[in-house]
């Protein structure tokens, strides 16, 4: 069975890739709009065509049609700005949302025609904020039940909800329970077997709503696990109720946990790791065609993989510069040997 391609977005080495389960790693070739040492903040597969990969970068939005072999810079109104988040609608690949942020001005952009035209959301986002100086749009989520409902969140600047496909937005973080509720790291919406759930990871709390954000319950990770900082929150494509969450002692952090929920965030199980990670788990992603295959990357470059849904993990030998987002494509990239940037590692080959 093919293991597909691992893609690791980094701040300083663009997108690193492996098509042989981490034995060898390859950086981008020369002569492309996306430099091999670019800052990449977001890596997003097109769920309908996972050989197509979008990257949020320091030059704007880039796209690859061949699992990251070659890249082109998309011509958009936000070209040249830092893109922090990209999300492609799994029901309609032409509908794409993009969030910009520090050092650029934070904004939400929408295209309904695969990038031919872009519209900036009419949302008042301040240029500066208290927590991180300049806001960045980190979180985007589609509603799997109602395609007209969407969510986005800012670090730092609030939680927003749309009921009309993203034309109009309402700020709703005032309904959350604890301080620092405007600092949003991630959002997931799950169908949950007919009992739809919205789950939000704030800097210091994890929230859950069963009524589309009207009321919330939640927990403080520092009280439950001794780690105050909530970061990654991921769900397998099409999952009814499975979630992965990362907790840490801060950013970049010195320790971190991965938790899994099988009941849409009502309860959580700490997953076993083969060793202590060196920093906060920053990104968790699954193969969209096989949810047992999981990648998890830390802020300071550790990469862990699981092929049994997180029951067991392997730390990969290759370590990276700052990891920003990971992705696992089921498509095996055809990587030219000349692009290989590291030699095979003996332990990986064995």
Describe each region flagged by the PLM:
Residues 1-350:
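Extracellular glycan-interacting surfaces
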């Amino acid at each position: 069975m093919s293991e597909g391609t691992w893609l690791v977005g980094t701040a300083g080495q663009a997108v690193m890739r492996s098509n042989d389960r981490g034995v060898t790693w390859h950086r981008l070739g020369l002569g492309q709009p996306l430099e091999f040492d670019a800052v990449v903040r977001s890596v997003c597969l097109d769920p309908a065509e996972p050989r197509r990969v979008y990257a949020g970068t320091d030059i704007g939005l880039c796209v690859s049609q061949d699992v990251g072999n070659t890249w082109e810079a998309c011509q958009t109104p936000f070209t040249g700005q830092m893109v922090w988040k990209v999300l492609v609608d799994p029901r309609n690949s032409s509908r794409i949302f993009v969030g910009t942020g520090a050092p650029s001005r934070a904004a939400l952009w929408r295209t309904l025609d695969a990038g031919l035209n872009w519209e900036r959301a009419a949302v008042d986002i301040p240029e500066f904020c208290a927590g991180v100086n300049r806001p960045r749009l980190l979180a985007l989520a589609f509603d799997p039940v109602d395609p007209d409902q969407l969510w986005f969140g800012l670090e730092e600047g609030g939680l927003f909800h749309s009921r009309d496909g993203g034309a109009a937005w309402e700020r709703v973080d005032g309904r959350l329970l604890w301080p620092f509720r405007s600092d949003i790291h991630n959002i997931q919406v799950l169908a949950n077997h007919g009992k739809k759930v919205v789950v939000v990871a704030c800097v210091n709390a994890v929230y859950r709503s069963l009524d589309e954000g009207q009321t919330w319950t939640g927990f403080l990770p520092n009280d439950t696990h001794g780690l105050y900082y909530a970061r990654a929150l991921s769900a397998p494509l099409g999952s009814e109720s499975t979630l992965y969450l990362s907790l840490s002692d801060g950013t970049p952090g010195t320790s971190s946990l991965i938790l899994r929920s099988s009941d849409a965030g009502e309860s959580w199980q700490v997953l076993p790791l083969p060793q202590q990670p060196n920093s906060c788990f920053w990104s968790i992603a699954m193969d969209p065609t096989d949810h047992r295959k999981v990648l998890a990357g830390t802020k300071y470059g550790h990469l862990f993989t699981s092929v049994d849904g997180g029951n067991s993990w392997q730390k990969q030998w290759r370590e990276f510069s700052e990891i920003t987002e990971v992705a696992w494509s089921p498509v095996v990239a055809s990587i030219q040997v000349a692009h290989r940037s590291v030699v095979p590692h003996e332990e990986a080959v064995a």
